[in-house]
UniProtKB/Swiss-Prot annotation:
One of its GO terms (cellular component) is virion membrane. Homotrimer; each monomer consists of a S1 and a S2 subunit. The resulting peplomers protrude from the virus surface as spikes. It is a single-pass type I membrane protein. This is Spike glycoprotein.
Length: 1349
């Protein structure tokens, strides 16, 4: 059994090691916890930073993300000093601490002088996971040695698979005295190491600094003994996560003051400043305070003056509210898991635990777990969580079927016995019990199987640890009965079916007898649908929470009253032991219902109920639901007696009822908002503005970053911190405007005079100064200069406004998939996406129709349209040639081509068989056909001639035979040659046939001998194959057992690799289709979004067109630059493609007059007047009125003024709206990716080869028999009589040869004409060496021939 240690469980780390190297001088004295330093991490001088991989940066500042300590964090002193005794509490938490991302250590170099030598001592540190010899531990241990009277310090670094002692410790230099021996690991064999190396350090340094962190399975180490910034030491890929670190106690007789200050590392952004020599001289933790964030925003240690929008802040909780229902009983899950009986997979058992408490650490300590992993939830979160209830299913695991239980896998267990629901939050526990403490129960849960005789005895004689599982499941209708009717002839015995069921059917066989036959032939597992009947036993797969509905049933084994089936009638099940190494393997599936909501809670991290703090931001844990919020007490009557939690429509916690006091509360989120930092370059810190938030809310809660608070006050913009309130005054220039007419002014003199302020003051910003005119009539609100137009010209502006657009409809399925069926089938899984797309486009088209109707209504009355402008462009496509795309078209494309060939140019050939006389006959005639009868051959005393005649011979013999028949008996002698010729040639045919017959007998005899030898060879081969088969079958059985062992560990192996590949190909194809669908749906979605945006723009432009029709075309607009450029005169409108075309005429100013104007005048100190549609202007120290559109001074009269009741001016400032340009703060990508791969458990493979039977084959006898058969075959050589092949040429007639001769002469004449009479002119006959001129001189050609013998 390969045991997997669950490092995620807190109880797994009771001590650092598990090997008891020593038990002497060990006690349980509590010496306290590690002390906390009064010094904090100050990163400004580089403390906690490092030179990244020793890279050099010159005279620059860099923003780097990495693992750094938090600025302002404290240290813990992890050093432990002993003399003789060690405390067991030293080797447990908090001294054994989580490593997480990494640690930064500040180690004091404790120097002790003895005998004139100054010794250097400090403790060793180890970093690892389980600290056993199956995992690597990193050890950094100091050692000193005296060389020539000088002390040399070494850092011995090793990364090895140490077996760590339970109480590890180191000792000081032997010269300082020791009462213990150094003992921190114990390994009898050679230790496997990845890294070993020694580094020197300065023994005179006051402090040493270490920087250890891990990232992506790689460990990084940095170190320095000079300065604060650490330098690269080494890095090493481990591939595992280091979980803990431990500073080993140092024992020494001498009085040493040890300090090993450690602070954790986390992912931070730092601003690092380097000088011209590449030395890091300043560092900033960007998230430590507001000033640091300003530096990082500007990438400068000395940021310039400005107003900076920071990343904001979140009010931090000031208290914790914890609620659990008290006095709940213990769930006692471990007792049920350790029960004396456990079910088989076929009849797996379930139990629900609710309204009780459980302890995961206690549970794991009571069972021997092989592995524990969770699906859709982090396993470590189970400690301290609450659930509505926990449902646990368990059963014994057959040894060969454990692989079936992997989440998402298939196989017998998950297909036909127990299906794991991957959609819910669940955890899978694999554990084992001793064989003596457990037995496996067998029970068939199928009601219809048990109705027809299946009981526990039907499983036969099974061992106490044999687990029964189904290999196929079958379901039947309620009316099913397997017994036949008595009217059937043949088959099994009759039976009486229960009431309400249907007896087995019969059908008329070929013999016309009523014969009984099974519905499912030959059995339901192999039934393929024969005859006209349908097998009522239908194969099914189970779903989560279902048992197998029934095993298969062979109906011919059922009979009796009532109908009962024999045990062997039930098929499709198997059994196998659950024992392995003397323990029974058991599977338990924890189904977690209503995660973080309920009264079934883990007590591992449970706390006591606290007081409910209201109206401030708090951390809450309410019956397992955790979060942050502000609790507001309300009087709610809508909770029922069994309800404690209230949710909103989005599924978020909205309120709760306290179980103890019955009080009800609403939950509001803690404030998270915008912060503006106002910074002046001459100041060392900024003033802050918490937008839209009162100071009482800011300081009643704890904000994210601590502030050196000087003063604060509420303003129109929000809470202002560290600035002086000076809103009674105003400034005309401001470098730090904050909006809404306010300014934060920095006054250096103010800070030097008033030490309680920061030099910032919050005041009004008025960038203008009113220059009042001394007059008996006083202007109201000041006197200002503006320009008023005095001369004009007529201008024209042509404007097009779109009021409609083409309608768009999309066939979504065709757009995405075309006509690809697989794509369309998978597209259906996307639900109503396509319907939604078309619905949106329909809404867009309806919106366009409505908009067009509104535009048309505005044009119906009072507007004359000009001739409609032609919309659209004619595009002629008739001349486009598509043949390059479509290829060749028409009947000419497939016409077959013809060719000529010269076959047997000179003669026609006829071949015939020759037994020896044809060649001699041919040699005798020499080609003279008249010598035919003279050259008669003799073959074994018989006169013979070849059975072949030429045309001339046929003519001659025919003429002779004809002459002999014309004038008998005078011409009878002329027929003698003919008759001899026929007889001799018949003899030739007979001789040839006789030779062929003799050869045929020889072939048959030799073939019979060969068959005997072949048969003997086959017998020998068969005997050898029988032996081979026996050995191969034995090894196949062994291999089958091995494959079963492998399948337990490596995954379900299909019947063939081709099936696996086909499934993988199908999955890959489906994944690729899904990617393509997603891509095309994204494009379609973007297009539809663009259509929505465009339709909105069209709607707005159409509304603008309607407004311009009403105001510009139907009337004269008083608005400047609305109907054209300038003051409107007249507008015309024309219809245009997809819109309206406007022509505006207006008069445009060409010259302006600068005038002094006032918004009003105050007469007699209490009566005010203001201009009506114009301005009051001061002309030559007298007040007059002029219109706003053109300069034309006229006296102030009652027609151009409005009388006011007072001269006072009410000032109102509109609030400013500023866009939040901060980037969303997304979670770390690595952390988010980690959520998908956490808590993955593995099962070690069992690669035992005990089942393989290695057998050697002895096939010598069979090989000898085969050799004898080969000899017989070799002796079956057939010596056939030679039958030659004679070729007889049939010559062509004389006129054919004449034509060939004439054609040759013509060709020679043509060649002479071409070569000698053309091409080179008349001079060709003058050349001796060739027919063509050679201007480079005569060249001789030497032709050499060679003959190969």
């Amino acid at each position: 059994m390969f045991f997997i240690l669950l490092i995620s469980l807190p109880s797994a780390f009771a001590v650092i090691g598990d090997l008891k190297c020593t038990t002497s001088l060990i006690n349980d004295v509590d010496t306290g916890v590690p002390s906390i330093s009064s010094e904090v991490v100050d990163v400004t001088n580089g403390l906690g930073t490092f030179y990244v991989l020793d890279r050099v940066y010159l005279n620059t500042t860099l923003l780097l993300n990495g693992y750094y300590p938090i600025s302002g964090a404290t240290f813990r002193n992890m050093a432990l000093k002993g003399t003789r005794l060690l405390s067991t509490l030293w080797f447990k938490p908090p001294f054994l601490s989580p490593f997480n991302d990494g640690i930064f250590a500040k180690v004091k170099n404790s120097r002790f002088s003895k005998d004139g030598v100054i010794y250097s001592e400090f403790p060793a540190i180890t970093i690892g996971s389980t600290f056993v010899n199956t995992s690597y531990s990193i050890v950094v241990e100091p050692h000193t040695s005296l060389i020539n009277g000088n002390l040399q310090g070494l850092l011995q670094i090793s990364v090895c698979q140490y077996t760590m002692c339970e109480y590890p410790h180191t000792i000081c230099h032997p010269n300082l005295g020791n009462q213990r021996i150094e003992l921190w690991h114990y390994d009898t064999d050679v230790v496997s190491c990845l890294y070993r190396r020694n580094f020197t350090y300065d023994v005179n340094a006051d402090y040493l600094y270490f920087h250890f962190y891990q990232e992506g399975g790689t460990f990084y180490a940095y170190f320095t003994d000079t300065g604060f910034v650490t330098k690269f030491l080494f890095k090493l890929y481990l591939g595992t996560v280091l979980s803990h670190y431990y500073v080993m106690p140092l024992t020494c007789n001498s009085a040493l003051s040890l300090e090993y200050w450690v602070t954790p590392l986390t992912t931070r952004q730092f601003l690092l400043a380097f000088d011209q020599d590449g030395v890091l001289y300043h560092a900033v933790d960007c998230a430590s305070d507001f000033m640091s964030e300003i530096m990082c925003k500007t990438s400068s240690i000395t940021p310039p003056t400005g107003v900076y929008e920071l990343n904001g802040y979140t009010v931090q909780p000031v208290a914790t509210v914890y609620r659990r229902i008290p006095d709940l009983p213990n769930c006692d899950i471990e007792a049920w898991l350790n029960s004396k009986t456990v079910s088989s997979p076929l009849n797996w058992e379930r139990k629900i635990f609710s309204n009780c408490n459980f302890n995961m650490g206690r549970l794991m300590s009571f069972i021997q777990a092989d592995s524990f992993g969770c699906n859709n939830i982090d396993a470590s979160r189970l400690y301290g969580m609450c659930f509505g209830s926990i449902t646990i299913d368990k059963f014994a695991i057959p040894n060969s079927r454990k692989v079936d239980l992997q989440v998402g896998k298939s196989g017998y267990l998950q297909s036909f016995n127990y299906k794991i629901d991957t959609a819910v939050s669940s955890c899978q526990l694999y554990y084992s019990l001793p064989a003596a403490n457990v037995s496996v129960t067998h029970y068939n849960p199928s009601s219809w199987n048990r109705r027809y005789g299946f009981n526990n005895q039907s499983f036969g004689s099974r061992g106490l640890h044999d687990a029964v599982y189904s290999q196929q499941c079958f379901n039947t209708p309620n009316t099913y009965c397997p017994c036949r009717t008595s009217q059937c002839i043949g088959g099994a015995g009759t039976g009486t079916c229960p009431v309400g069921t249907t007896v087995r059917k019969c059908f008329a066989a070929v013999t016309k007898a009523t014969k009984c036959t099974c519905w499912c032939q030959p059995d339901p597992s192999t039934y393929k649908g024969v005859n006209a009947w349908t097998c009522p036993q239908s194969k099914v797969s189970i779903q989560p929470g279902q048992h197998c509905p029934g095993l298969g049933l062979v109906e011919d084994d059922c009979s009796g009253n009532p109908c009962t089936c024999k045990p062997q009638a039930f098929i499709g099940w198997s059994s196998e032991t659950c024992l392995q190494n003397g323990r029974c393997n058991i599977f338990a599936n924890f189904i977690l219902n209503d995660v973080n909501s309920g009264t079934t809670c883990s007590t591992d991290l449970q706390q006591g109920n606290t007081i409910i703090t209201t109206d401030v931001c708090v951390n809450y844990d309410l019956y397992g639901i955790t979060g942050q919020g502000i609790l507001i007490e309300v009087n709610a009557t809508y909770y029922n007696s069994w309800q404690n939690l209230l949710y909103d429509s989005s599924g978020n916690l909205y309120g709760f009822r306290d179980y103890l006091s019955n009080r009800t509360f609403l939950i509001r989120s803690c404030y998270s908002g915008r912060v503006s930092a106002v910074f002046h370059a001459n100041s060392s810190e900024p003033a802050l503005m918490f937008r839209n938030l009162k100071c009482s809310h800011v300081f009643n809660n704890t904000i994210l970053r601590q502030i050196q608070l000087v003063n604060y006050f509420d303003s129109y913009l929000g809470c202002v911190v560290n600035a002086y309130n000076n809103t009674a005054s105003a400034v005309s220039t401001c470098d730090l405007t904050v909006g809404s007419g306010y300014c934060v002014d920095y006054v250096t003199a103010l800070r030097s005079r008033r030490s309680f302020t920061t030099g910032y003051r919050f005041t009004n910003f008025e960038p203008f100064a009113a220059n009042l005119v001394n007059d008996s009539i006083e202007p109201v609100g000041g006197l200002y200069e503006i320009q008023i137009p005095s001369e004009f010209t007529i201008g024209n502006l042509e404007e097009f406004i779109q009021t409609r657009s083409p309608k768009v409809t999309i066939d979504c399925a065709t757009f995405v998939c075309g006509d690809y069926a697989a794509c369309r089938q998978q597209l259906a899984e996307y639900g109503s996406f396509c319907e939604n797309i078309n619905a949106i486009l329909t809404e867009v088209n309806e919106l366009l129709d409505t908009t067009q109707l509104q535009v048309a209504n505005s044009l119906m009355n009072g507007v004359t349209l000009s001739t409609k402008i032609k919309d659209g462009i004619n595009f002629n496509v008739d001349d486009i040639n598509f043949s390059p795309v479509l290829g060749c078209l028409g009947s000419e494309c497939n016409r077959a081509s013809t060719r000529s060939a010269i076959e047997d140019l000179l003669f026609d050939k006829v071949k015939l068989s020759d037994v020896g006389f044809v060649q001699a006959y041919n040699n005798c005639t020499g080609g003279a056909e008249i010598r035919d009868l003279i050259c008669v051959q003799s073959y074994n005393g018989i006169k013979v001639l070849p059975p072949l005649l030429s045309e001339n011979q046929i003519s001659g013999y025919t003429l002779a035979a004809t002459a002999a028949s014309l004038f008998p008996p005078w011409t009878a002698a002329a027929g003698v040659p003919f008759y001899l010729n026929v007889q001799y040639r018949i003899n030739g045919l007979g001789v040839t046939m006789d030779v062929l017959s003799q050869n045929q007998k020889l072939i048959a005899s030799a073939f019979n001998n060969a068959l005997d030898a072949i048969q003997e060879g086959f017998d020998a081969t068969n005997s050898a194959l029988v032996k081979i088969q026996a050995v191969v079958n034995a090894n196949a059985e062994a291999l089958n057992n091995l494959l079963q062992q492998l399948s337990n560990r490596f995954g379900a192996i299909s019947a063939s690799l081709q099936e696996i590949l086909s499934r993988l190909d199908a999955l890959e194809a489906k994944a690729q289709i899904d990617r393509l669908i997603n891509g095309r749906l994204t494009a379609l979605n973007a297009y539809v979004s663009q259509q929505l945006s465009d339709s909105t723009l069209v709607k707005f432009s159409a509304a603008q067109a309607i407004e311009k029709v009403n105001e510009c075309v139907k009337s004269q607009s008083s608005r400047i630059n609305f109907c054209g450029n300038g003051n409107h005169i007249i507008s015309l409108v024309q219809n245009a493609p997809y819109g309206l075309y406007f022509i505006h005429f207006s008069y445009v100013p060409t010259k302006y007059v600068t005038a002094k104007v006032s918004p009003g005048l105050c007469i007699a100190g209490d009566i005010g007047i203001s201009p009506k549609s114009g301005y009051f202007i001061n002309v030559n120290n007298s007040w007059m009125f002029t219109g706003s559109s053109y300069y034309y001074p006229e006296p102030i009269t009652q027609n151009n003024v409005v009388v006011m009741s007072t001269c006072a001016v009410n000032y109102t400032k509109a609030p400013d709206l500023m866009l939040n340009t901060s980037t969303p703060n997304l979670p770390d990508f690595k952390e988010e990716l980690y959520q998908w791969f956490k808590n993955q458990s593995s099962v070690a493979p069992d690669l035992s080869l005990d089942y393989i039977n290695v057998t050697f084959l002895d096939l010598q006898d069979e090989m000898n028999r085969l050799q004898e058969a080969i000899k017989v075959l070799n002796q079956s050589y057939i010596n056939l009589k030679d039958i030659g092949t004679y070729e007889y040429y049939v010559k062509w007639p004389w006129y054919v040869w004449l034509l060939i001769g004439l054609a040759g002469v013509a060709m020679l004449v043509l060649l002479f004409f071409i070569c000698c009479c053309t091409g080179c002119g008349t001079s060709c006959f003058k050349k001796c060496g060739g027919c063509c001129d050679d201007y480079t001189g005569h060249q001789e050609f030497v032709i050499k021939t060679s003959h190969d013998d």
